[in-house]
Amino acid sequence: MPTINQLIRKGREKKVRKSTAPALKCNPQKRGVCTRVYTTTPKKPNSALRKVARVRLTNGIVVTSYIPGVGHNLQEHSVVLIRGGRVKDLPGVRYHIVRGALDLAGVKDRKQGRSKYGAKRPK
């Protein structure tokens, strides 16, 4: 516990909060080009083939990002929109690709939670 004199001399130091998505550089989303589209396996208790892509952003940073939803039309040189948000069971994946934006199509036949997967309202 500091004395009043110590507080006058030094003051309290503000805690600096580290960003969870540093490659976005304080932007809500960033555009990028896919350099590699592949599947990975998740961490220990889970088992699957998760779809991910290596993306070179417009600021030159290369990140690994997750492709949400069932099925996708991404390939090398596809232009995508990246948002923050990590995938808990994939180490090193701290970004999501936005469905229904730029080259990535929305999820087909999606009935619920459509806005998160870029699906239009079914007729």
Swiss-Prot record:
One of the protein's GO biological processes: translation
Alphabetized GO MF terms: rRNA binding; structural constituent of ribosome; tRNA binding
GO annotation, cellular component aspect: small ribosomal subunit
Entries under Pfam families matching the protein: Ribosom_S12_S23
Database matches in PROSITE patterns: RIBOSOMAL_S12 (PS00055)
UniProt keyword list: Methylation, Ribonucleoprotein, Ribosomal protein, RNA-binding, rRNA-binding, tRNA-binding
Modified residues (3-methylthioaspartic acid): D89
Stored SUPFAM superfamilies: Nucleic acid-binding proteins
Family: Belongs to the universal ribosomal protein uS12 family.
Record text on subunit structure and interactions: Part of the 30S ribosomal subunit. Contacts proteins S8 and S17. May interact with IF1 in the 30S initiation complex.
Protein task: With S4 and S5 plays an important role in translational accuracy.
Protein name in UniProt: Small ribosomal subunit protein uS12
Encoding gene (name): rpsL
